[in-house]
Amino acid sequence: MRITVIGAGLAGVEAANAITKFGIKVRLYEMKPKKFSPAHKQEGFAELVCSNSLKSKLLTNASGLLKEEMKLFGSIVMEAAYNTQVEAGQALAVDRYLFSEYITKKIKQNPLIEVIHEEVTEVPRDEVVVVSTGPLTTESLLEDISKLCNSKNLYFFDAAAPIVLKDSIDFSKAFFASRYNKGTDDYINCPMTKEEYERFYYELVNAEVIEVKDFERDLLFEGCMPIEEMAKRGIDTIRFGPLKPVGIIDPKTGKMPYAVVQLRKDTQDGRLYNMVGFQTRLKWGEQKRVFRLIPGLENAEFVRYGVMHKNSYINSPQVLTKFLSLKKYPNIFFAGQITGVEGYLESAATGIVAGINAARYVLGRAQITLPPSTCIGALIEYITTPKKDFQPMNANYGIISIDEEIARIKDKEKRKLLIAEKSLSVCREIANQIF
């Protein structure tokens, strides 16, 4: 028995590591050092191409909970992180070179893993495979993946607006309404006066943006312009675009506002709302500063900031099962950023689940799902649940399912700790049954 894993990034090494725990051999393909993507520089596995931080260690942060869940499932990424960490306060940061070296050595020393340094241009249809090729998958392999998934279910870049926790919105200023009172009042509206709009506008057009990489320069011309770029065309451009107030009446004044920012429900339970038309390249700190100038969002809690970057990913809700296998090919699994998760640990976590399920598929055992009351389970639930506009998602407490008892707790810190406690109890039980 052998399983093929394509790509030795964070998801790929986790998948390979998880598979070997079942005594199954792995053939791990990695095109480096023969070929590099535009973002990669190191020859080793699990290269951290952006920050060297794996975010917070605190359980009151979803990233902290995700770390603890991953540890319960024998994560090689978490093992490497704690063995190569550098001082970073309450965050877990690593020496990126030692981190990659640690994982590369561990994988290459595993007698069940055969490493092949070659580019894969086609996904085998008749083998059990885990595809974990990342957001910069090569064009030739993407072409084959488009055949597997149908080309309309393949995306080539992110253009995601910020997502806000509904509980953090000030409804003494914001209100529910639909344009022209048509249909149900599905949108949260944040009205602006002329003075408020102009203040927001000038801060928006002068805010710091993320530098555009050479291989991303065409994104601004793909029909999805960042809000700040649109604003630079003229002071009224966005007021006649995503912030147009036509058809909306502020119930407090009985009049149409000068401008309106709308938020649309992002999850079925209505706990998360996305800012309509706010795709952006602003730096995250700038997004928090500038978007909190919007009336009603002064204390907004952003569970995901807006992004626009090159990022190849599949339409997971349409093509993947809850086991992370293709609906059309149950022997082919996907993991990592190519599934539509966002972030280092999020990618690694899906690698663990895909690896476990690929192994159990080979062994003829029932595959596993983690409940959405866990962080890993909530992420997979999010990327495999049908939605109109699927955009990548990172770990956050807003997507984790909670019961009425927890929902009644007003203290946010206490509520998060209770969610974490229940989640880890469930993960511990499942992990003990698996391994």
UniProtKB/Swiss-Prot annotation:
GO CC terms, sorted: cytosol
Keyword Methyltransferase (UniProt): yes
Alphabetized Gene3D superfamilies for the sequence: FAD/NAD(P)-binding domain
Molecular-function GO terms, alphabetical: flavin adenine dinucleotide binding; tRNA (uracil(54)-C5)-methyltransferase activity, 5,10-methylenetetrahydrofolate-dependent
Pfam families cross-referenced by the UniProt entry: GIDA
Main localization of the protein described in the UniProt heading: cytoplasm
Sorted UniProt keywords: Cytoplasm, FAD, Flavoprotein, Methyltransferase, NAD, NADP, Transferase, tRNA processing
Localization (cell): Cytoplasm
Chain sites annotated for binding FAD: G7, A8, G9, L10, A11, G12
Catalytic activity: uridine(54) in tRNA + (6R)-5,10-methylene-5,6,7,8-tetrahydrofolate + NADH + H(+) = 5-methyluridine(54) in tRNA + (6S)-5,6,7,8-tetrahydrofolate + NAD(+); uridine(54) in tRNA + (6R)-5,10-methylene-5,6,7,8-tetrahydrofolate + NADPH + H(+) = 5-methyluridine(54) in tRNA + (6S)-5,6,7,8-tetrahydrofolate + NADP(+)
GO BP, one annotated term: tRNA wobble uridine modification
Keyword Transferase attributed: yes
EC assignment: 2.1.1.74
Cofactor(s) it depends on: FAD
NCBIfam families assigned: gid_trmFO, PRK05335.1
Record family assignment: Belongs to the MnmG family. TrmFO subfamily.
Functional summary from the UniProt entry: Catalyzes the folate-dependent formation of 5-methyl-uridine at position 54 (M-5-U54) in all tRNAs.
Name of the protein: Methylenetetrahydrofolate--tRNA-(uracil-5-)-methyltransferase TrmFO
Native organism: Caldicellulosiruptor saccharolyticus (strain ATCC 43494 / DSM 8903 / Tp8T 6331)
